[in-house]
UniProtKB/Swiss-Prot annotation:
NCBIfam families reported in the protein's UniProt record: PRK13666.1
The organism of origin for this protein: Lysinibacillus sphaericus (strain C3-41)
Protein name per Swiss-Prot or TrEMBL: UPF0358 protein Bsph_1390
Family matches, as HAMAP family: UPF0358 (MF_01560)
Pfam family membership, one: DUF1507
Recorded family membership: Belongs to the UPF0358 family.
Coiled-coil segments on the chain, per record: none
Length: 93
């Protein structure tokens, strides 16, 4: 595989991972906008499943050499910070 193709695959992989992370971030923001609702176990289960799936996608991309492990960690850390804000906002209410 030539360098140009490899770079293209790496860019596409990163775009897809960031798009999936953005979907999860939207789920988090929706929940933050509706904090008046009681805590929803189904919502939490969906969010946990999405986060786990994204972590598996990132591990796969790292193993293929499409992204650096540190970049994958940054993506997950960003989402975990948003989840922490959601948790803090909910428990402080």
């Amino acid at each position: 595989m030539d360098t140009k193709s490899q770079t293209s695959f790496q860019e596409k992989a990163l775009e897809l991972l960031i798009a999936d992370a953005d979907k999860i971030a939207r789920l988090i923001r929706v929940q933050m906008d509706h904090l008046t609702m009681p805590q929803c176990p189904l919502y939490e289960e969906v969010l946990d499943t999405q986060m786990f799936g994204l972590s598996r996608e990132i591990d796969f991309a790292v193993k293929l050499g499409l992204i650096e492990r540190e970049k994958g960690k940054e993506i997950l850390d960003s989402l975990e910070k948003e989840l922490s804000v959601l948790h803090d906002a909910y428990t402080d209410k």
